[in-house]
């Protein structure tokens, strides 16, 4: 059973015991004070006043003592400030854009000579203004970063010497281009690459993305470049790896590859014809000796290009030193020969073809003889060198060197 108590006209009497003697303390006279007097006092306190408040006159108006009036004013201020603190906590937690307090509390807080009201308005509007400024700063900084990064990448692209104006939108591909050019390729190969590179601006422009997203694009573009450019290295034939020393010299002299047809011709002859015996070399020597007896007047040819030691070393060793000597006279062209010397050249080419069959993939014997033919070294100089070598007893050592080279090549 719950007892219902009427809340109307409820009076409480409170007795307070103090732990110290009061002495000659006299109890204050009873004061009549109600809520209407509280509201009237707060209206006076909250109004902006030009000067100080006359508390004595105000106490006489309310018919109370001065001490009671000051205590009541302090209590009203404390209540209003507690409401302001609660509003400030709400502003800090919710971070709302309109944290204006209630109108009644604001009008009450303005009684402190206008300072609490200004403080609430300033602190209330300070947090949202920071938020708005941060929101404004964030989208403004991002386009500036994007713009500056893109202009810096395009500036770095233009400085290395980009040939196409359409490549400025793809700086990742352009940065890789000087690296590929530094491999010492021929200018003709670089010209062959330009048509596929011109179709590369299909990649998305960097203006729509931040700079950090270009790293996967670089790896993807590297793979595409390697897949597109890898077949270009296979066009040079079988001996392109052995002629890497010639590329730096030929880039300065001419654009067309000088030894590509010879390399292909060597490949066809090596694959089509079988390896012959050593008797073909003996027949070669006999034919040269007979041709030397028939034409003694042609022995005054230049001896300087083919000394005896160099001919022996070119037959025995499989080095690449004879290639640059034959590479440069080839570009100069052979002189016009008479029909008789042309027939001798035909015989010498047949013999060099047989000598070319004896070697496997190395361009030591075949390419050195073909280079000497193309370099217009006369037949008489070769025959004279061979005859002098035979007369001095070097034929046996020469044949043993050739047989040793063939044996080490085919019988290993």
UniProtKB/Swiss-Prot annotation:
The answer, when asked if Mitochondrion is one of the entry's keywords, is no
Q: What gene makes this protein?
A: atg29
**Keyword Ligase attributed:** no
Do you know which Pfam families this protein is assigned to? ATG29_N
Bias (Low complexity) occurs at 98-114, 148-159, 310-322
Disordered as annotated region, ranges: 92-379
Q: Where in the cell is it found?
A: Preautophagosomal structure
Gene3D superfamilies for this protein: 1.10.10.2570
Q: Name one GO biological process term.
A: autophagosome assembly
- The name this protein goes by in its record: Autophagy-related protein 29
Q: What does this protein do?
A: Plays a role in autophagy. Functions at the preautophagosomal structure (PAS) in order to form normal autophagosomes under starvation conditions. Also plays a role in mitophagy and regulation of filamentous growth.
Record's keyword terms, sorted: Autophagy, Protein transport, Transport
Its source organism is Penicillium rubens (strain ATCC 28089 / DSM 1075 / NRRL 1951 / Wisconsin 54-1255) (Penicillium chrysogenum)
**Family in the record:** Belongs to the ATG29 family.
């Amino acid at each position: 059973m719950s007892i219902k108590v009427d809340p109307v006209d409820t009076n409480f009497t409170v007795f307070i015991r103090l732990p110290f003697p009061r002495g000659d303390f006299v109890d204050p006279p009873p004061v009549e004070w109600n809520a209407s007097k509280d509201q009237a006092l707060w209206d006076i306190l909250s109004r902006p006043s030009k000067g100080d408040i006359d508390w004595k006159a105000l106490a006489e108006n309310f018919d109370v003592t001065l001490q009671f009036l000051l205590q009541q004013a302090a209590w009203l201020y404390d209540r209003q400030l507690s409401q302001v603190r609660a509003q400030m906590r709400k502003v800090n937690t919710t971070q709302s854009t309109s944290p204006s307090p209630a109108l009644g509390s604001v009008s009450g807080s303005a009684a402190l000579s206008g300072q609490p009201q200004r403080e609430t308005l300033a602190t209330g509007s300070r947090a949202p203004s920071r938020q708005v400024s941060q929101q404004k700063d964030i989208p403004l900084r991002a386009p500036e970063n994007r713009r500056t990064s893109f202009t810096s990448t395009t500036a770095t692209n233009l400085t290395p010497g980009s040939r196409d104006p359409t490549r400025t939108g793809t700086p990742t591909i352009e940065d890789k281009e000087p690296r590929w050019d530094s491999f010492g390729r021929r200018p003709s190969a670089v010209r062959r690459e330009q048509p596929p590179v011109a179709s590369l601006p299909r990649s998305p422009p960097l203006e729509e993305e931040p700079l950090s997203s270009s790293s996967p694009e670089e790896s993807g573009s590297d793979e595409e470049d390697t897949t597109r450019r890898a077949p270009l290295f296979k066009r040079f034939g079988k001996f392109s790896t052995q002629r890497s020393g010639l590329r730096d010299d030929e880039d300065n002299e001419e654009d067309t590859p000088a030894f590509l047809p010879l390399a292909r011709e060597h490949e066809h002859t090596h694959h089509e014809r079988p390896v012959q015996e050593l008797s073909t070399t003996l027949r070669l020597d006999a034919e040269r000796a007979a041709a030397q007896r028939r034409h003694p007047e042609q022995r005054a040819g230049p001896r300087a290009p083919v000394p005896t030691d160099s001919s022996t070393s070119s037959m025995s060793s499989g080095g690449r030193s004879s290639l640059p000597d034959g590479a440069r006279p080839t570009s100069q062209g052979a002189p016009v020969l008479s029909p008789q010397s042309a027939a001798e050249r035909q015989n010498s080419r047949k013999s060099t073809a047989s000598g070319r069959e004896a070697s496997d993939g190395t361009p030591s014997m075949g390419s050195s003889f073909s280079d000497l033919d193309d370099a217009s070294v006369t037949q008489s100089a070769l025959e004279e060198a061979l005859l002098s070598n035979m007369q001095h007893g070097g034929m046996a050592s020469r044949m043993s060197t050739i047989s040793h080279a063939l044996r080490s090549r085919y019988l290993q």
